[in-house]
Amino acid sequence: MKNTPNPSPRTHCIRCGECCLHSSPTLHAKDLAQVVGGSIRPDHLYTIRKGELVRDNVRGGIAPADQEMIKVRDKKGGCVFYTAEEMACSVYENRPAQCASLKCWDTAEFMELYRSPKLQRQDVIENGVLLGLIEEQEKRCSYAALSDYVRRISDEGEKAVEIILDLLKFDFHLRPFLAEKLGLRVEEMDFFFGRPLTETIVTFGLKVEKQPEGGFLLTRIERNGVLE
């Protein structure tokens, strides 16, 4: 079919849902009131920690995050707040700033917001004990350290693997333990401590298999029958 120019350039949202289906928003400092006020809850969110490999939908490509970012969770079919049946946002009146600024026909406002400060966990969390535990996790399980030990596998072999497994175990067991001790919901852990390293380790070409006795086995991911 021959493409014909649109004689009337779009000037308003037609609720096609493409932006909601494509990806979920990252929160900015402007979104603090919605999070503190409860319109957007911790269980709606997850944190991308500094150094975590992410896809940049604006600049393109995959690269380590240069700063912490808080994102709205995705679900099958787009953003967790998007209701496909109604083609609408369930928190529209309190939607994130990125959503409010995004106009697919004119991205100037969105790009201005994109360059503004991102919301950080320390902006939201007032519990000093919890903030201290987040800092301790970052010291022990930073992506910079994980990336370094992954690179050292080729030279140090099992020694580097054991250190990586220790990092994964600490991060894995920290979550249910603190959920119980601090009265937090398990669904909130990805906001407070980022996604589990046992899941994000795949970005390094590795995967974790949980053993029957409770231990972890670290292996390389096979693609098309070839080990990466």
Task: Write out the residue ranges for each language-model feature.
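Hydrophobic scaffolds flanking metal-cofactor catalytic centers in soluble metalloenzymes
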Residues: 1-228
